[in-house]
Design a protein with these regions (language model features):
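Domain-scale signature associated with acetyltransferase and cell-envelope carbohydrate enzymes
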Residues: 1-117, 139-140, 174, 183, ...
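Glycine-rich NAD(P)-binding loop of Rossmann-like domains
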Residues: 77, 128-138
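A short, glycine- and basic residue-enriched loop/turn
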Residues: 135-136, 153-154, 175
Length: 239
């Protein structure tokens, strides 16, 4: 697709449909879901187990070939939880599995195919039990790169970046960049530099969302329903 051919009213209707889908099908599966959420293709977000909590202004982007999966499978009665803070973003293919607890604090971003788990899910010698478990804590404003894996018992400090494909098996301190298998610190961030987070992006949500709507109205103003249907059935290079 070279551009969005939908007329404004179709895109607006689609957005309302996704919000309704989240409220009808996904919200009841969660212990809490904050307001201001954005779910892209929410029918590809799969939830299993409880408790799972998601904070305000969450952004979840799923796809047919890369579903987001949040799974709580307790190793003992009364344990197991996934807690996702405010302003967090999960990209296509993200998987989070919790036998004890996985906590993402505010402003965290997980790129495509990231896997976070607090368990081995099988023992080395006992392949029946869940195996060793240890809670995972990802502190505020952490950015985890594409296809990285965060293993049991890990704590990642605030503002830290985890490189693409990294395998994190030990704690990573705050304000650094870590990469590799196993992940090691490769660079320290300058603590004197001002850090801009997703919280600032959503600081004035009414104005922000009104701006998005105004942009769509302008950008899609020339699109007609007839042209959109023709594009779907008979696409051409001129589209």
């Amino acid at each position: 697709m070279r551009k969005d051919h939908r007329p404004y009213f179709v895109k607006h209707l689609y957005h309302r449909m996704t919000v309704a889908y989240v409220n009808h099908f996904i919200r009841p599966q969660l212990d809490s879901l904050g307001w201001g959420f954005t779910f892209m293709k929410p029918w590809y977000v799969k939830i299993f187990g409880a408790p799972i909590r998601i904070g305000r202004f969450a952004t979840l982007v799923a796809a047919s070939d890369r579903r987001i999966r949040l799974c709580v499978w307790p190793d003992q009665p009364g344990r197991g939880a996934i807690v996702i803070g405010d302003y967090c973003m999960l990209c296509p293919g993200v998987r989070i599995g919790a036998a004890q607890a996985v906590v993402l604090k505010d402003n965290c971003m997980l790129a495509g195919n990231v896997y976070v788990t607090d368990s081995d899910w099988h023992g080395i010698y006992n392949r029946i039990s869940v195996g060793k478990t240890a809670a995972v804590t990802i502190n505020s404003n952490v950015w985890i790169g594409d296809s990285a894996i965060v293993c049991k018992g890990v704590t990642i400090g605030e503002n830290t970046i985890i490189g693409a494909g990294a395998v994190v098996v030990d704690d990573i301190p705050a304000n650094c960049i870590a990469a590799g298998n196993p992940a090691k610190v490769t660079r320290r961030l300058d603590p004197a530099r001002r850090m801009v987070t997703r919280a600032q992006f959503f600081a004035d949500p009414v104005t922000l969302f009104a701006g998005f709507d105004a942009f769509d109205r302008r950008w899609l103003a020339q699109n007609t329903f007839r042209h959109w249907v023709r594009h779907l059935l008979f696409p051409s290079r001129s589209d």
